[in-house]
């Protein structure tokens, strides 16, 4: 009894399974039939041999996304898109990063050719030319009437050398201006320009400039020696003064005592003075001793224009 029940149940299960299998087989056949239908086309012309076209639906089942994908697959591959992409990649790569640090310096270049050797003689000659140009430029401000055209005479346009005509007595405790000069006729003496007055012993500046002056006086103090012992305040001063105002303007001065054992001694004074145009200079002797002094006729007075 129990055996017959188990047999009937098994037979019923087999029938049910067979029916399900037949339904699955039928569905598979329908699917393959749809694949083999004329709606499926092969796109050999588009370069995809053997590819199948998905089934088309006539209803709302066909979506825009599906058609877009089909158009993308079927598009001609001409390589322009890849070129555009490569161009964009290069451009983006060129602008993406910051510039790097500068590279290391390169190796030094070859040494240059040796320079021209400069001798001390060449340097000295060049220095002399520079000095000459500077001197000519310094004197370029003088009036043309005072500058001769000859280059050898341009540096000294006013100069003089003169001597006393005769001895000059200087009384005790007095200040005397020396006058009465003469231009020596011996070789070596000179008188250039028109600024010197020999009779007055005065030189008048033709232009505002710097001048050099010198006076060399031979003093005879034999009378003072005969009086015995000299005092400490017995001395003589020689001055070159501007406008006869020795204490108001700058003056050149030399002081000498009278303790010399010789009968005649020499007092010299020299230096530079700046004179305005029209000012004059002259030589003065200040005798502070208690006896008369004699300035011998060999005493001299000289001067020259240096520059503006």
From Swiss-Prot:
Residues 36-119 are annotated as: Disordered. Changing residue 93 to A: Enhances protein processing. Residues 1-21 form the signal peptide. Changing residue 39 to A: Decreased N-glycosylation. Keywords: Disulfide bond, Glycoprotein, Hormone, Secreted, Signal. Residues 82-93 have a biased composition (Basic residues). One of its GO terms (molecular function) is hormone activity. InterPro entries: Adipolin/Erythroferrone-rel, C1q_dom, Tumour_necrosis_fac-like_dom. Belongs to the adipolin/erythroferrone family. Insulin-sensitizing adipocyte-secreted protein (adipokine) that regulates glucose metabolism in liver and adipose tissue. Promotes glucose uptake in adipocytes and suppresses de novo glucose production in hepatocytes via the PI3K-Akt signaling pathway. Administration lead to reduction of blood glucose. Able to attenuate inflammation in fat tissue. PANTHER family: ADIPOLIN (PTHR24019:SF12). Homomultimer; disulfide-linked. Adipolin fC1QTNF12: homotrimer; disulfide-linked. Adipolin gC1QTNF12: homodimer; disulfide-linked. May interact with ERFE. This is Adipolin. It comes from Mus musculus (Mouse).
């Amino acid at each position: 009894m129990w055996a017959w029940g188990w047999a009937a149940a098994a037979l019923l299960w087999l029938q049910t399974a067979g029916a399900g299998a037949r339904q699955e087989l039928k569905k598979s056949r329908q699917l393959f039939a749809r694949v083999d239908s004329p709606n499926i086309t092969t796109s050999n012309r588009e370069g995809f041999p053997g590819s199948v076209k998905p089934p088309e639906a006539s209803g709302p089942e066909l979506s825009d996304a599906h058609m877009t994908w089909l158009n993308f697959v079927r598009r001609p591959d001409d390589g322009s898109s890849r070129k555009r992409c490569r161009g964009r990649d290069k451009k983006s790569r060129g602008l993406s990063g910051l510039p790097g640090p500068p590279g290391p310096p390169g190796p030094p270049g070859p040494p240059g050719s040796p320079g021209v050797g400069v001798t001390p003689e060449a340097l000295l000659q060049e220095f002399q030319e520079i000095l000459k140009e500077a001197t000519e430029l310094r004197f370029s401000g003088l009036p043309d009437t005072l500058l001769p055209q000859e280059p050898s005479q341009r540096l000294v346009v006013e100069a003089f050398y003169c001597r006393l005509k005769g001895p000059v007595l200087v009384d005790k405790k007095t200040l005397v201006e020396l006058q009465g000069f003469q231009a020596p006729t011996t070789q070596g003496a000179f008188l250039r320009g028109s600024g010197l007055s020999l009779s007055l012993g005065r030189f008048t500046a033709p232009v505002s400039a710097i001048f050099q002056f010198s006076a060399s006086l031979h003093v005879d103090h034999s009378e003072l020696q005969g009086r015995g012992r000299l005092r400490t305040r017995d001395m003589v001063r020689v001055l070159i003064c501007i406008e006869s105002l020795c204490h108001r303007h700058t003056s050149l001065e030399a002081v000498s005592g009278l303790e010399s054992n010789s009968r005649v001694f020499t007092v010299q004074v020299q230096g530079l003075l700046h004179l305005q145009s029209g000012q004059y200079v002259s030589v003065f002797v200040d005798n502070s001793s208690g006896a008369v002094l004699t300035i011998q006729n060999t005493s001299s007075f000289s001067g020259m224009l240096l520059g503006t």
